[in-house]
Amino acid sequence: DAQEMLSRYSDELGVGMVPFREFVYLEEEKRYEEVSRVPKAARVASISGTQVREQYLNRGRTLPEWFTRPEVAEILGEAYPPRHRQGACIWFTGLSGSGKSTTAEVLTTLLLECGRQATVLDGDVVRTHLSKGLGFSKEDRDTNIRRIGFVAAEIVRHGGVAICAAVSPYKATRNDVRNMVGADRFVEVFMDTPLEVCEQRDAKGMYAAARRGDIKGFTGIDDPYEEPENPELRLETVVATPEENAASIVQYL
């Protein structure tokens, strides 16, 4: 397919192609041969580039010695670790009191038990350090989320798991973070908890203060929360425990 596509656009690209046919491995003769020259009764083996990625590298399987030298297979395994060793960003989003931080803590424990390097970036904690001095205007909220996203992207780039728990109410900003991290490494987890349940859990009295008008621009009361349209996971904390929800995330990963 790649050769056909390049041939089709070679004039436009100004790049010529030296075509080559597929080679397969003759198991009994222990040699390679161009596919059109292989006898019909011969036993052959072949692996495509897609199979190398999906069936071997992504699953941590060793490439067979007939396909490549062990030294090369080892280098490929280090350069393209299996999915369970790749970096990832688990981004919890939802209203205050929806269960983000609690589920994130349980998930962190599970991942550490599995031998993964996991780092929690809690929105409230980040505000007191990395984002100290920022307010709650839309601009400041976006800045806070992007700072968390930047740190998460660095963790992911070095093979770690960034577990981020932040209200992150705006779709556009969450998408910015997705692009920052890389769409294939970003797992958006929407904690789908009704507002009334979040208010019942209001241990800090923030919702009550917002209802009284003591706090302005509080998400869910007088500032909007934009629900994710297509999150990787949608979890309900009313019908499932934090342990069950964390297990669902591990299973997804």
Regions found by a protein language model. Give the residues of each.
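Active-site cores that bind ATP or allylic diphosphates and position pyrophosphate for catalysis
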Residues: D1-R85
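Conserved beta-strand scaffold positions in the cores of enzyme catalytic domains, especially
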Residues: M17-P19, V120, F186-E188, E232-R234
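ATP-dependent NMP and nucleoside kinases share a basic, alpha-helical "lid"
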Residues: H129-G135, A152-R211, G217
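Conserved substrate/cofactor phosphate-moiety recognition/catalytic segment
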Residues: S98, A104-R157
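Hydrophobic anchor at the beta1->P-loop junction of P-loop NTPases
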Residues: I90-F92
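P-loop (Walker A) phosphate-binding loop of NTP-binding proteins
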Residues: L95
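Short, well-ordered alpha-helices that flank and scaffold nucleotide-derived cofactor binding pockets
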Residues: R8, E105, T109, E113, ...
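Small-molecule kinase domains that catalyze NTP-dependent phosphoryl transfer to phosphate-bearing small molecules
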Residues: L26, D192-S248
